[in-house]
């Protein structure tokens, strides 16, 4: 079993997603639903961190990222086998060009 860690940017991303859906789209029920889905998906990585293949970018990155679709959002994470840890780096709108956000 792996520990799951959220980087501050990932937490900020998730808060912004939930607030946007609740306030801008006037749909607090949908906001609560996506918050639950994001939390459940993050926790599922404890047991199945390799559920998705590694993301192959055009340029070299510091980490071997994996991406997991959660409704309309992409959860970007990497796995540290030595530390038995999954680090969730970002959560972004799936149609966004997220390659610029990764290091």
Across the structure, where does each feature detected by a protein language model lie?
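Arg/Lys-rich, positively charged N-terminal/basic patches that mediate binding to nucleic acids
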Residues: 1-37
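Enriched for short, Lys/Arg-rich terminal
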Residues: 25, 70-74, 78-103
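Short, solvent-exposed helix-to-loop capping segments enriched in aromatics
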Residues: 42-53
């Amino acid at each position: 079993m792996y520990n799951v860690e959220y980087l501050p940017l990932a937490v900020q991303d998730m808060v912004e997603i939930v607030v946007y859906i609740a306030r801008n789209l006037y749909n607090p029920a949908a906001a609560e639903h996506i918050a639950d889905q994001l939390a459940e998906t993050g926790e599922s990585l404890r047991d199945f961190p390799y559920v998705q293949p590694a993301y192959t970018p055009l340029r070299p990155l510091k980490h071997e990222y994996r991406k997991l679709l959660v409704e309309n959002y992409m959860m970007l994470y990497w796995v540290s086998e030595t530390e038995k840890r999954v680090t969730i780096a970002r959560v972004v709108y799936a149609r966004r060009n997220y390659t610029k956000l990764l290091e």
